[in-house]
């Protein structure tokens, strides 16, 4: 009995021990399973896989209706949280059967974009806050200039982002491009103005200056202003607009509705080859969705490195308000426009424009010395060669000091660079600078002044390239007609080049997109020496086909003095080869003013012989002509007076050509042939089919000759000092 009882007790203890072991085993397995599940969860999340909720959905397959969860594809900001990202370009397969779960990743919520995700634009605005100005233009006779965006725009076509109108003033924006007071803005901001004022911001407030209009270009919609600042201004840096890509982020800075330093953000939406805006063809505009409103005209379009890549000019709007489509003139076009007048512009230093360091870009060549390193304000000059008597800011940036310790570097605007001087010139200085190397401050010329070529309007244009270059890389006088095929006229070593339009192509028999029309040639220039004539069509330059004046200029930039350039020219239906050489004739042409238009060789038109200087050819006309009329009503134009061209006030070198006169258009009938072609009141017609019309007799003869020919009519027009061609 006792043994039996003992056996029973031993068996009970064994069963209890076995149960405990089983429980421990099951608990261990459960822990392992949880670890495996947790590890799988972490692995899936780290490799861009499904979230836990999606795993539970997969585990519950077949237990309920299928739900397709939309996918939010992440852009650049999707990389902020890689643990919750969705592979770019992932495609979702459709359900294989009714009620099945589609293999679609769940929606990913990235949350708000972090500050500064698109670039350091806040520092860019800080950098440019003193480089963007408000431009106020007052119209003549105290009347407000027209503002078409103030009314509805039912045609839905692009219109200028016109300056906001305040009683008798228009408000726009401008960009300081040089610290000595040069400012670029839009042509339509200051057109028709008799006074212009500029408000410049600084670190302590603002200063209002009276501005002078230096030059304007209607086709580019650009104007260059000049103020006389009390202290050096802060200049912006013009970047490379050709390097900007579609979808690059930009900001627009301006004065919309008079609200100064307003910043909007967007992207480059497109690059437009040609746009007709209010009857004027503009080329290579940058399209952006950054908000541009009335008053933004002339303001900068800026990329993340702080450089200006465009000058805001127009918007596409059905009602006058911003509709998400704006346009800006590329900075590369603005640079050429400015360099034609000022010669040099600031450029970013090695540290980058975003650091606020702006260096002076002197004319290339001549061995101009490099700028010195930054120095602390108040430091004694270590020089003993005369530089100790100079202003240190001529060569150095100054680091200001305060409270006994240096402050961060600040840009110090350098003074205006000294003028170029010929090598071997005797120094006029007596303060020690006569012992210095002149190349430290001056551009050294090889014994001669920089080459300049006169345009057909009589003004001398400076090279934007070194003196040894053949290219006059400038934009010459441009017309405002919409038949300009998107670009304007360029003067090339004495030849005025105009792009082919459909009407001009019909006149010459050359299709649009092939060749460049030569609208005028100045005597005693390389172009005239090569044999070019007005009416020729330039097909090739140095063996390369050309279709725009800018392409010709770009090719010529690569050439150097003394090199012969082969030209392919179409004349009277025959292709001829000519050679253009920059020899003594080219140098001598620098000092030759453009002759009177009546003295220029005229091409044969309509089978007529060329006109001799000072004479008018009248096919079939009597030897003694009757007294001509004094008033004309022709093609919708009323003409009563004849006068000499009047250049824009303040444009250096733009003087009337001696003896040149034209027929002034008093009025243009709406809807007439002249109005459709783009003629306006106060236009001055200089030539009709290459015949000068300096008086009633010549105009009457030219009208009769054009009527008898029965062909399209080619008019040379002067508008506000700019000459261009219109085909009727």
Swiss-Prot record:
The main enzyme category here is: hydrolase
Q: Which SMART domains does this UniProt record tie to the protein?
A: PDZ
- The primary gene name is mamE
Q: Which GO terms describe its biological process?
A: proteolysis
What is the recorded membrane topology of this protein?
Single-pass membrane protein
Q: Which InterPro entries match?
A: Chloro_Bact_Ser_Proteases, Cyt_c-like_dom, MCR, Multihaem_cyt_sf, PDZ, PDZ_sf, Peptidase_S1_PA, Peptidase_S1C
Assembly, per entry = Might interact with MamB via PDZ1.
Q: Which PANTHER family match?
A: PEPTIDASE S12, PROTEASE DO-LIKE 8, CHLOROPLASTIC
Residues involved in heme 2 binding: 438, 441-442
- Outcome reported for the amino acid change (mutating residue 221 to A): Some loss of magnetic response. Significant loss of magnetic response, MamE, MamO, MamP no longer processed when amb1002 to amb1007 are also deleted
Segments carrying motif MCR 2: 421-444
Q: How is its activity regulated?
A: Autoproteolysis is stimulated by exogenous substrates or peptides that bind to its PDZ domains; may be stimulated by an environmental cue in vivo. Protease activity is tightly regulated; increasing its activity decreases substrate levels and disturbs biomineralization.
Protein name as annotated: Magnetosome formation protease MamE
Q: Indicate the segments annotated as coiled coil, or none if absent.
A: none
The entry summarizes the disruption phenotype as follows: Cells have no magnetic response but still make empty magnetosome membranes. Alterations in localization of magnetosome proteins; MamA is mislocalized to random foci near the cell membrane, while MamJ is more diffuse than in wild-type. Alterations in localization of magnetosome proteins MamC, MamF and MamI. Deletion of genes mamH to mamV (amb0961 to amb0978) gives cells with no magnetosomes and no magnetic response.
Motif MCR (magnetochrome) 1, per the record, lies over 375-398
The cross-references to PROSITE patterns, in alphabetical order and at most eight, read:
CYTC (PS51007), MULTIHEME_CYTC (PS51008), PDZ (PS50106)
Question: What are the positions of the active site?
Answer: 188 (charge relay system), 221 (charge relay system), 297 (charge relay system)
Q: What does its PTM field state?
A: Subject to autocatalytic cleavage; cleavage also requires MamO.
Transmembrane region(s): 22-42
Could you say which protein family the record assigns here?
A: In the N-terminal section; belongs to the peptidase S1C family.
Q: Which residues lie on this side of the membrane: Lumenal?
A: 43-728
């Amino acid at each position: 009995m006792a043994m039996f009882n003992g056996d029973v007790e031993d068996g009970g203890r064994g069963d209890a021990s076995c149960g405990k072991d089983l429980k421990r085993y099951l608990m261990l397995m459960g822990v392992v399973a949880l670890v495996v599940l947790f590890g799988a969860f972490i692995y899936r999340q780290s490799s861009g896989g499904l979230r836990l909720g999606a795993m539970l959905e997969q585990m519950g397959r077949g237990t309920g209706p299928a739900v397709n969860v939309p996918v939010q594809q992440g852009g650049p900001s999707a990389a902020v949280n890689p643990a919750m990202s969705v592979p770019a370009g992932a495609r979702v397969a459709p359900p294989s059967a009714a009620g099945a779960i589609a293999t679609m990743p769940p929606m990913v919520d990235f949350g708000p974009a972090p500050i500064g995700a698109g670039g350091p634009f806040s520092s860019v605005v800080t950098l440019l806050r003193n480089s963007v100005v408000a431009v106020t233009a007052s119209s003549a006779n105290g009347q407000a200039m027209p503002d078409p965006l103030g009314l509805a725009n039912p045609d839905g076509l692009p219109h200028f982002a016109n300056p906001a109108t305040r009683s008798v003033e228009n408000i726009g924006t401008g960009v300081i491009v040089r610290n000595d007071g040069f400012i670029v803005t839009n042509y339509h901001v200051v057109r028709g103005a008799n006074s212009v004022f500029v408000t410049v911001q600084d670190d302590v407030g603002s200063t209002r200056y009276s501005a002078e209009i230096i030059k304007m270009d209607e086709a580019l919609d650009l104007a260059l202003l000049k103020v006389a600042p009390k202290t050096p201004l802060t200049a912006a840096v013009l970047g490379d607009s050709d390097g900007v890509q579609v979808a690059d982020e930009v900001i627009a800075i301006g004065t919309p509705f008079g609200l100064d330093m307003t910043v909007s953000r967007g992207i480059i939406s497109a690059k437009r080859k040609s746009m007709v805006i209010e009857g004027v063809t503009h080329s290579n505009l940058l399209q952006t969705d950054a908000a541009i409103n009335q008053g933004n005209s002339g303001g900068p379009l800026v990329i993340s490195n702080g450089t200006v890549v465009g000058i805001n000019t127009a918007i596409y709007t059905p009602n006058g308000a911003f509709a998400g489509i704006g346009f800006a003139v590329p900075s590369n076009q603005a640079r050429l426009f400015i360099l034609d007048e000022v010669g040099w512009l600031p450029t970013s230093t090695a540290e980058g424009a975003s650091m606020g360091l702006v260096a002076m870009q002197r004319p290339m060549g001549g061995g101009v010395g490099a700028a010195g390193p930054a120095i602390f304000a108040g430091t004694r000059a270590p020089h003993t060669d005369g530089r100790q008597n100079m202003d240190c800011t001529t060569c150095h940036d100054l680091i200001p000091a305060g409270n006994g310790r240096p402050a961060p570097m600040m840009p110090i605007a350098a003074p205006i660079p000294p003028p170029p001087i010929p090598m071997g010139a005797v120094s006029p200085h007596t303060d020690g600078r006569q012992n210095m190397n002149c190349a430290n401050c001056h551009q050294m010329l090889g014994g001669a002044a920089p080459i300049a070529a006169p345009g057909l309007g009589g003004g001398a244009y400076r090279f934007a390239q070194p003196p040894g270059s053949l290219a006059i890389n400038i934009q010459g006088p441009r017309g405002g007609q919409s038949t300009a095929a998107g670009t304007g006229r360029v003067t090339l070593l004495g030849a005025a080049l105009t792009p082919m339009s459909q009407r001009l192509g019909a006149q010459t028999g050359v299709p649009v997109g092939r060749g460049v029309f030569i609208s005028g040639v100045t005597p005693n220039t390389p172009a005239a020496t090569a044999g070019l004539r007005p009416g020729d069509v330039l097909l090739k330059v140095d063996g390369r086909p050309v279709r725009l004046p800018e392409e010709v200029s770009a090719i010529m930039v690569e050439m150097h003095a003394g090199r012969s350039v082969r030209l392919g020219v179409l004349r009277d239906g025959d292709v001829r080869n000519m050679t253009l050489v920059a020899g003594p004739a080219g140098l001598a042409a620098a000092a030759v003013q453009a002759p009177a238009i009546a003295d220029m060789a005229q091409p044969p038109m309509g089978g007529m012989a060329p006109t001799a200087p000072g004479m008018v050819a009248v096919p079939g006309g009597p030897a003694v002509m009757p007294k001509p009329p004094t008033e004309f009503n022709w093609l919708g134009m009323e003409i009563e007076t004849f006068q000499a061209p009047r250049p824009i006030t303040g444009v250096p070198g733009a003087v009337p050509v001696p003896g040149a006169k034209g027929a002034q258009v008093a009025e243009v009938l709406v809807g007439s042939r002249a109005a459709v072609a783009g003629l306006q009141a106060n236009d001055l017609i200089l030539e009709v089919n290459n015949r000068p019309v300096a008086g009633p007799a010549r105009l009457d003869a030219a009208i009769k000759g054009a009527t008898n020919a029965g062909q399209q009519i080619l008019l040379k027009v002067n508008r506000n000092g700019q000459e261009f061609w219109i085909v009727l």
